[in-house]
From Swiss-Prot:
This is Small ribosomal subunit protein uS13. InterPro entries: Rbsml_uS13_C, Ribosomal_uS13, Ribosomal_uS13-like_H2TH, Ribosomal_uS13_bac-type, Ribosomal_uS13_CS. It comes from Burkholderia mallei (strain ATCC 23344). Residues 94-121 are annotated as: Disordered. It comes from the Bacteria.
Length: 121
């Protein structure tokens, strides 16, 4: 297995698909990395030479990926919550941020329904 940006890239996959195992790299960016480094994106990871892997590591190093990207996203959300803006408040309450309805739906964001307790007479 090839190791790029601290992630093991599966050997059996094409280079373009294998690079998407790295957090922060999707199909488009993976393809652009392959083109910039001169590596064929249809080549299997197991067929890459050490020189190819080094070129890929160099290109991936130009982007914010993995732990740094996760930290950056978390800090951005924390900043919104500290500001107390609308989006920050919605993050804090665990509700949708972008104007979706919440009277019904929004179950993914709100979590499972809480059962209503029956009133005693």
């Amino acid at each position: 297995m090839a190791r790029i940006a601290g992630v093991n890239i599966p050997n059996h996959q094409h280079t373009e698909i294998g690079l998407t195992a790295i957090f922060g790299i999707g199909r488009t960016r993976a393809r652009s990395i392959c083109v910039a480094s001169g590596v064929a994106f249809s080549k299997k990871v197991k067929d890459l030479t050490d020189a190819d892997l080094e070129k890929l590591r160099e290109e991936v190093g130009k982007f914010v990926v993995e732990g740094d990207l996760r930290r950056e996203v978390t800090m951005n959300i924390k900043r919104l919550m500290d500001l107390g803006c609308y989006r920050g408040v919605r993050h804090r309450k665990g509700l949708p941020l972008r104007g979706q309805r919440t009277r019904t739906n929004a179950r993914t964001r709100k979590g499972p329904r809480r059962a209503a307790q029956a009133l005693k007479k």
